[in-house]
Design a protein with these regions (language model features):
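Short flexible coil/turn linkers enriched for glycine and charged/polar residues
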Residues: 16, 65, 116, 163-164, ...
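Serine-hydrolase catalytic core recognition
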Residues: 54, 60, 188-494
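Conserved beta-propeller blade repeats
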Residues: 7-21, 36-62, 68-76, 81-113, ...
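Short loop/turn segments that connect beta-strands within beta-propeller blades
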Residues: 26-30, 76-79, 126-130, 173-177, ...
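Structural motif
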Residues: 19-21, 66-73, 118-123, 164-170, ...
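Predominantly five- to eight-bladed beta-propeller fold
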Residues: 1-34, 219-232, 285-295
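Residue-level recognition of beta-strand->loop/alpha-helix junctions
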Residues: 36, 85-86, 136, 312, ...
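A structural motif specific to WD40 beta-propellers
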Residues: 33, 82-83, 132-133, 180, ...
Length: 494
C-alpha cells in the first residue's frame, strides 16, 4: 500500500511544548499585528473574542500547568497588552471553554462562563474587570448559552439538573439577576430562542419520547403549543428494554447507569452482559433522552440476547467539579472503582450470568477496557474485552490534555507509573481484541503496537486488528465492518 509521510505537532506530556502566537490580519494593508502575549512562551492562548467596537481582543491565557488563567485585553491595532481583567486559580485545573459574549447594545458588558463555585455558571462582567453579578446558580452546570434578547435585558441558557440526567432551558433578567426555568417536564430540553427573546422553541425528548417540538412565549405563565410530535421511528422493530439505575459509588456519590435488556427478556434466564465504557472527561453517556443516550448497536446486541450497561463514573461530565476533578493525578483509578461498582450490580442480578461479562470502549474507553481486563483490581471479572484506539501510557499522550489531568510525569511519576498498562499484561486471562486506525493523530498507533510487542515478549496472546488509513475513529462504510467485528467477537468469546 503506498504511503506518504505526514508530520504533525504532537508534544508528549512532560516534553517541550510548541509556542503559539496570536495575530490580527489587516485585510486592507495585508499586514499582521501580533499580540504581545509575553512570557513564558509555553502558555495556552484560549477563547479569543473581540469587543463590539473591534478595538480590543480578549484572550483567556492559561499557564502551562493549567492551574491559573488570566483574562487579558490587547489593543487590536498595535498588539499591545492593555490589562488583565481578572484571574482564576485552582488547586487542580482551570479549563476555560467559552469566549466572552457581549450583551447586545453594550461595548463593556459581557457574560463569562466559569466553574469557580464548583459548577459551570454564567457571570456578568464589565470590561474594567468588575463582576456585576452571578447570573445562574445551583448545584448543576450550565450546559449551553443560547444568547440574549435584542434589547440585552435577558439571556437564555440550558442547564443540567442535580442528577445530571435532565436538561432545562432558562431565562435570566440581567438587570435584577432573577432567573426562571421555561420547562418542567423531566427529560432533555434543547432551546432555540427568537431574535427578540419573546419566543422559544423547545425540542424535547426523554426515555419514552422520541421528539416533541413546542413553541411558547418566554413570559411567565406562558402556555406551550405542540408544533410537532414525532412517531416512534422504531415502532415496527423489536427493541430492547431501556431503564436507568442509580448506583452507590465508593466515593460517596450516586452514579447514573443505563441498562438495555433484550426485548423478550425472561427473568428466569441467565444473560451475558456487556459494559460499554468511556468514563473520561467531557463525556456523559447516560441522559434522560430518547433511548437514554444509548446507540443503535446496543439495541442490536440486546436483540442478540445480551444485557448492555453503561455507567457514568467519577471523572465524567456535567456533575460538577468535585465529581469531575476527583480523578486528578490518577486517571483510571476511581474510574475503575466505579465501573466495577456497575459489575457488582450486574453480578447481583438473578438474570445475569456472572461468568459471562464483557467490556468494550474506545479512546479513553479503550484505556478503561484494557485496565479492566488486566489490572489486578479487576482480575477474573471480565471474560473478554474490546479496546479501540486505546491510550496505554499517558507519557505518550498529548501535552495539554494529559498535563491538565495528571500534571507532568516529572511532577507525578507515581500516577503515570500506576496507570501505564504495559506492566499489567501478565495479568491478562480473558480474550482481548485491540483495534487501531493506522493514521490515528489523537492516540498514536505507537500505543497499541508497543502493547503487541510487549505481549510477544511476555508470551501473552491477544487479538489485534488495524483499519488502514483511518484516524482516531472508524468512519464511513467501514464503521459497519467495525460493529460486525464487535458483534462477532462477543458471540465467539462471551
Amino acid at each position: 500500500m503506498p504511503a506518504t509521510d505526514r508530520k504533525i505537532r504532537y508534544p508528549y506530556a512532560g516534553s517541550k511544548s510548541h509556542h503559539v502566537t496570536l495575530g490580527v490580519f489587516d485585510t486592507q494593508s495585508g499586514k499582521t499585528i501580533y499580540l504581545n502575549t509575553g512570557e513564558p512562551a509555553e502558555q495556552y492562548l484560549t477563547n479569543v473574542s473581540w469587543t463590539p467596537d473591534d478595538k480590543y481582543v480578549l484572550v483567556a491565557v492559561v499557564n502551562r500547568e493549567q492551574n491559573q488563567m488570566w483574562f487579558k485585553q490587547f489593543d487590536a491595532a498595535t498588539g499591545a497588552f492593555v490589562k488583565t481583567l481578572f484571574e482564576e486559580i485552582s488547586d487542580k485545573w482551570v479549563e476555560p471553554q467559552h469566549p466572552a459574549v457581549f450583551v447586545p447594545g453594550s461595548n463593556n458588558r459581557f457574560v463569562w462562563q466559569s466553574d469557580r463555585d464548583g459548577f459551570n455558571h454564567l457571570y456578568l462582567y464589565e470590561t474594567d474587570g468588575k463582576v456585576i453579578r452571578q447570573i445562574s446558580k445551583g448545584k448543576f452546570p450550565v450546559t449551553s448559552m443560547y444568547g440574549f434578547s435584542t434589547d440585552g435585558s435577558h439571556c437564555f441558557f440550558q442547564t443540567a439538573d442535580e442528577t445530571g440526567l435532565n436538561r432545562y432551558v432558562w431565562t435570566a433578567n440581567l438587570k435584577d439577576g432573577s432567573s426562571r426555568r421555561l420547562n418542567e417536564e423531566e427529560g432533555v430540553h434543547n432551546g432555540i430562542i427568537s431574535q427578540n427573546g419573546d419566543w422559544a422553541v423547545d425540542i424535547f425528548s426523554n426515555l419514552a419520547t422520541p421528539r416533541f417540538i413546542y413553541t411558547q412565549k418566554t413570559t411567565p405563565g406562558a402556555v406551550r403549543n405542540l408544533a410537532f410530535g414525532a412517531k416512534n421511528p422504531l415502532e415496527e422493530y423489536q427493541v430492547g428494554i431501556t431503564k436507568f439505575t442509580s448506583l452507590p459509588s465508593p466515593g460517596g456519590v450516586r452514579l447514573n447507569a443505563r441498562l438495555i435488556l433484550p426485548a423478550n427478556y425472561d427473568a428466569g434466564k441467565k444473560y451475558p452482559a456487556i459494559i460499554y465504557v468511556y468514563n473520561g472527561s467531557h463525556v456523559q453517556m447516560v441522559t434522560n433522552s430518547w433511548m437514554g443516550g444509548g446507540e443503535m448497536w446496543m439495541q442490536r446486541m440486546a436483540n442478540e440476547g445480551y444485557v448492555v450497561m453503561s455507567i457514568d463514573g467519577r471523572g465524567s461530565a456535567n456533575r460538577g467539579c468535585e465529581f469531575e476533578q476527583s480523578t486528578f493525578r490518577h486517571l483510571g483509578d476511581f474510574e475503575m472503582e466505579d465501573q466495577l461498582t456497575g459489575v457488582q450490580y450486574l453480578q447481583a442480578q438473578s438474570y445475569i450470568d456472572p461468568a459471562r461479562i464483557g467490556v468494550f470502549g474506545w479512546s479513553f474507553g479503550g484505556f478503561m477496557t484494557t485496565s479492566l481486563m488486566t489490572r489486578p483490581e479487576a482480575k477474573g471479572v471480565f471474560k473478554c474485552g474490546i479496546a479501540g484506539g486505546p491510550v496505554l501510557d499517558w507519557r505518550m499522550y498529548e501535552i495539554m490534555y494529559t498535563e491538565r489531568y495528571m500534571d507532568t510525569p516529572q511532577e507525578n511519576p507515581e500516577g503515570y507509573t500506576q496507570n501505564s498498562l504495559y506492566q499489567y499484561i501478565g495479568n491478562l486471562d480473558g480474550r482481548l481484541l485491540m483495534i487501531h486506525g493506522t493514521s490515528d493523530p489523537v492516540v498514536l498507533w505507537q500505543h497499541s503496537l508497543k502493547y503487541v510487542q510487549e505481549c510477544v515478549k511476555k508470551g501473552k496472546q491477544i487479538d489485534y486488528f488495524v483499519y488502514p488509513e483511518h484516524e482516531h475513529n472508524v468512519i464511513g462504510p467501514d464503521r459497519a465492518h467495525l460493529y460486525e467485528m464487535v458483534e462477532r467477537y462477543f458471540k465467539d468469546h462471551l
